[in-house]
């Protein structure tokens, strides 16, 4: 047999052998899966970074809320005492007015 006959018998002129074609298809599928997995890993890393930033912002908001709560409680106490002082002053003025009226009415 000549070289062409051997090549024709082996299927060299007909293209790749079926096992090579299957191997190429499998390799293409593996490459596709690897590409998809790389994209997924990148997305997971981005998500982790965003979650970390969100956690930091939540901590800052919690700290701000705690400070606001303390300030509000302090302010509430301050105005409660101012209100009590005003009530005491009003009562003292009313008592003084009653005493003045009683003394003025009793002096006649």
From Swiss-Prot:
Residues 22-82 form the v-SNARE coiled-coil homology domain. The keyword Lipid metabolism does not apply. GO terms for biological process: defecation; nematode larval development; regulation of hindgut contraction; regulation of nematode pharyngeal pumping; synaptic transmission, cholinergic; synaptic vesicle exocytosis; vesicle fusion. InterPro entries: Synaptobrevin-like (IPR001388), Synaptobrevin/VAMP (IPR016444), V_SNARE_CC (IPR042855). Keywords: Cell membrane, Coiled coil, Cytoplasmic vesicle, Membrane, Synapse, Synaptosome, Transmembrane, Transmembrane helix. It comes from the Eukaryota. It holds the Pfam family Synaptobrevin. The chain crosses the membrane at residues 86-106. It is found in: Cytoplasmic vesicle, Secretory vesicle, Synaptic vesicle membrane; Cell membrane; Synapse, Synaptosome. The keyword Manganese does not apply. It is a single-pass type IV membrane protein. GO terms for molecular function: SNAP receptor activity; syntaxin binding. Residues 107-108 are extracellular. Signal peptide: none annotated. CDD domains: R-SNARE_VAMP2. PROSITE patterns: SYNAPTOBREVIN, V_SNARE. Belongs to the synaptobrevin family. PANTHER family: SYNAPTOBREVIN FAMILY MEMBER. Involved in the targeting and/or fusion of transport vesicles to their target membrane. Acts in neuronal exocytosis of synaptic transmission. Likely to have a role in cholinergic transmisson. Required for viability, coordinated movement and M3 pharynx motor neuron function. Part of the SNARE core complex containing CBG09569/SNAP25, snb-1/VAMP2 and CBG03570/STX1A. This complex binds to cpx-1/CPLX1. This is Synaptobrevin-1. It comes from Caenorhabditis briggsae. The gene is snb-1.
């Amino acid at each position: 047999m000549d070289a062409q006959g051997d090549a024709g018998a082996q299927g060299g002129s007909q293209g790749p052998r079926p096992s090579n074609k299957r191997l190429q298809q499998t390799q293409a599928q593996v490459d596709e899966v690897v590409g998809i997995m790389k994209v997924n890993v990148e997305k997971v890393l981005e998500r982790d970074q965003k979650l970390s930033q969100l956690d930091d912002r939540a901590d800052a908001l919690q700290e701000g809320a705690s400070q606001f709560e303390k300030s509000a409680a302090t302010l509430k106490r301050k105005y409660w005492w101012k209100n009590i002082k005003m009530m005491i002053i009003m009562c003292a003025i009313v008592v003084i007015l009653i005493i003045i009226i009683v003394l003025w009415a009793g002096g006649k």
